[in-house]
């Protein structure tokens, strides 16, 4: 990073800045101009010391040279892809549909829905065995029984399974059944959980927190990458704004912005953003047009009887009608589905 000294900074103040930088174990290089002095700070922990240096007398501004997210940054490496089972997600791959119910409710239910979504074109099965609910009295999921049902659905259909992990203590159990770990919106800032999934052998689908900035999301991904897991997928799932016409606002600008800043696959979840079945198809089409590498769409064969979020799940008929429209949009931007 670069430290810009104030125009009236004294030589004593400049030397104190240099001394402090070197006390942090960093290298300081002074460059003297006609009216300003700048100090180049070099070292792996330079950005971590930014606030301490900025508070010193004689400092006008700090200019970071490198991004604080080193592992997630796109830089010159281009886009990467992530394998979930035998399905690859990424900028240079086909657009993928990740579909299924909000919650696994029974063996019969998940087997039926898995078959339906596969026949319509889905390539990955989603389903919650552990459910983070606003109310403690709401359905919390079937836990390991639900995981077993998901594994049976995978065996029947061949669809790899994505399911949410909420507690690091449940991770070993979930790893026995799942093909991908989902970190939900409420846990995007759960750094203990991020570190644990970062040590997992499974890929991680990281959802943006509903009050998180794009920078926050990337830094949460950095936690996972820093623990050694390179297989991270970013998911835009809606943010909380002043408007309450829908549950959240699906921030589709995040898709191209994230792609410009990171090499990680970026997907969208219009179901949870809207919370209303009637608007999910339109926003699904818009997400593909924005460049999303995959869509997460909830589908339920009896949404009126669903134990969670039935009003946002597409019926099999609506889902089947949406597929050719999604493929047409993908083709229009030079991609396949």
Segments from the language model and where they lie:
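Active-site mouth loops of central-metabolism enzymes
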Residues: 8, 95-112, 135-140, 160-164, ...
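N-terminal amphipathic alpha-helix/helix-capping segment at the start of soluble metabolic enzymes
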Residues: 67-98, 324, 331-337
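Active-site/ligand-binding-proximal alpha/beta "capping" segment
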Residues: 84, 225-287
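Hydrophobic faces of well-ordered beta-strands that scaffold small-molecule active sites
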Residues: 95-101, 123-127, 161-163, 179-183, ...
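Glycine-enriched alpha-helix->loop->beta-strand junction motifs that scaffold or abut catalytic
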Residues: 121, 173-182, 198-204, 225-231, ...
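Glycine-rich, proline-tolerant flexible connector loops at the mouths of alpha/beta enzymes
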Residues: 126-144, 301-311
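Conserved anion-binding
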Residues: 129-133, 186-253
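Alpha-helix-loop-beta-strand connector modules within alpha/beta enzyme cores
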Residues: 139-163, 196-203, 252-267, 312-335
């Amino acid at each position: 990073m670069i430290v810009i000294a104030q125009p009236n900074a004294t030589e004593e103040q400049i030397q104190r800045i240099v001394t402090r930088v070197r006390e942090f174990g960093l290298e300081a290089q002074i460059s003297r101009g006609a009216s300003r002095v700048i100090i180049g700070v070099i070292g792996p922990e330079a950005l971590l010391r930014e606030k301490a240096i900025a508070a010193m007398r004689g400092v006008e501004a700090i200019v970071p040279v490198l991004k604080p997210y080193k592992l997630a940054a796109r830089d010159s490496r281009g886009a990467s892809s992530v394998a979930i089972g035998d399905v690859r997600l990424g900028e240079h791959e086909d657009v993928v549909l990740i579909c299924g119910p909000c919650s696994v409710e029974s063996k019969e239910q998940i087997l039926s829905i898995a078959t339906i979504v596969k026949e319509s074109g889905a390539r990955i099965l989603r389903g919650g065995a552990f459910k983070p609910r606003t109310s403690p009295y709401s359905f919390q999921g079937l836990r390991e029984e639900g995981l077993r049902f998901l594994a049976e659905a995978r065996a029947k259909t061949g669809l790899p399974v994505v399911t949410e992990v909420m507690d690091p203590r449940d991770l070993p159990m979930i790893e026995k059944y799942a093909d991908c770990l989902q970190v939900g919106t409420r846990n995007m800032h759960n750094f203990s959980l991020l570190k644990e999934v970062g040590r997992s052998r499974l890929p991680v689908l990281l959802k943006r927190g509903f009050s998180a900035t794009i920078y926050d999301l990337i830094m949460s991904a950095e936690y996972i990458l820093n623990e050694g897991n390179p297989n991270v997928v970013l998911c835009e799932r809606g943010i909380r704004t002043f408007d309450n016409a829908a549950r959240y606002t699906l921030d589709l600008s995040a898709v191209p912005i994230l792609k410009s800043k990171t090499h990680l696959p970026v997907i969208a979840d219009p179901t949870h953003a809207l919370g209303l079945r009637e608007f999910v198809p339109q926003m699904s089409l818009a997400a593909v047009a924005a460049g999303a590498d995959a869509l997460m769409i909830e589908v339920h064969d009896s949404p009126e009887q669903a134990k969670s979020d039935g009003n946002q799940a597409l019926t099999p008929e609506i889902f089947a009608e949406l597929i050719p429209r999604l493929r047409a949009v993908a083709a229009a931007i030079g991609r396949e589905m």
